[in-house]
């Protein structure tokens, strides 16, 4: 199976977790796009969705799925999204698609976080994939200097603004052994909106696409 076929398999497998009559949290990226395709097949059974990006919102609306503002929703039953990396503790690096802040907000209000990913995203130690940090533009240089102090090599993501109007620093050269501590440390730097470490709020279930089919991993 190609990587895209693996992504499609996990996107459709996530339908099993969608309960009728609920509002579904939907992520961003190529794997989440397959989940939106799948969700469209049962759109008459759900109330609608909350979306983590303008791109996902447009795709949901193109299928006629109602998209709710996050402020209209107290709690979501599930949030389904991909990951750039996921470890055995269900901690993730996310934000390759620059939607990390909205993704983190939706994850916070969801009872269950379903991570959908192909097997290439599974790692023993987080950090090979550059860690995205969303930063208020005027703080870019200061935050970059602080990230260097933490051992990182931050790179300004050129010509990219988040849906919130901020910039992204991608931090290379990290071996993340304590993801919760690093998430807290980076989030405390003035000017950081959020870091793409999902460790304090990791995944509850991971659906991993492999050549042998979709494997389900649950947080122990």
Swiss-Prot record:
It catalyses: aldehydo-D-ribose 5-phosphate = D-ribulose 5-phosphate. GO terms for cellular component: cytosol. GO terms for molecular function: ribose-5-phosphate isomerase activity. Pathway: Carbohydrate degradation; pentose phosphate pathway; D-ribose 5-phosphate from D-ribulose 5-phosphate (non-oxidative stage): step 1/1. Keywords: Isomerase. Its EC number is 5.3.1.6. It holds the Pfam family Rib_5-P_isom_A. InterPro entries: NagB/RpiA_transferase-like (IPR037171), Ribose5P_isomerase_typA_subgr (IPR020672), Ribose5P_isomerase_type_A (IPR004788). Substrate binds at residues 28-31, 81-84, 94-97, 121. The active site is at 103 (proton acceptor). GO terms for biological process: D-ribose metabolic process; pentose-phosphate shunt, non-oxidative branch. HAMAP family: Rib_5P_isom_A. Belongs to the ribose 5-phosphate isomerase family. Homodimer. Catalyzes the reversible conversion of ribose-5-phosphate to ribulose 5-phosphate. This is Ribose-5-phosphate isomerase A. The gene is rpiA.
């Amino acid at each position: 199976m190609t990587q895209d076929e693996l992504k499609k398999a996990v996107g459709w497998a996530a339908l099993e977790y969608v309960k009728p009559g609920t509002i579904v949290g939907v992520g961003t990226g190529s794997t989440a796009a397959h989940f939106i395709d799948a969700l469209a097949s049962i759109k008459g059974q759900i109330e609608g969705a909350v979306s983590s990006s303008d791109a996902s919102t447009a795709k949901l609306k193109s299928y006629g799925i109602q998209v709710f503002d996050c402020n209209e929703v107290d709690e979501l039953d599930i949030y389904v999204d991909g990951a750039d990396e996921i470890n055995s503790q269900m901690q993730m690096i996310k934000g390759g698609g620059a939607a990390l802040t909205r993704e983190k907000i939706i994850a916070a209000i969801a009872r269950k976080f379903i991570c959908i990913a192909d097997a290439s995203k599974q790692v023993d130690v987080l950090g090979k994939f550059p860690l995205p940090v969303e930063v208020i533009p005027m703080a870019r240089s200061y935050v970059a200097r602080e990230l260097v102090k933490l051992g990182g090599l931050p790179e300004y993501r050129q010509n990219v603004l988040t849906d919130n109007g901020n910039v992204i620093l991608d931090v290379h050269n990290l071996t993340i052994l304590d993801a919760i501590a690093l998430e807290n440390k980076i989030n405390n730097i003035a000017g950081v909106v959020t870091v793409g470490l999902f460790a304090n709020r990791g995944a509850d279930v991971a659906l991993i696409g492999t050549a042998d089919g979709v494997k389900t991993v649950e947080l122990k």
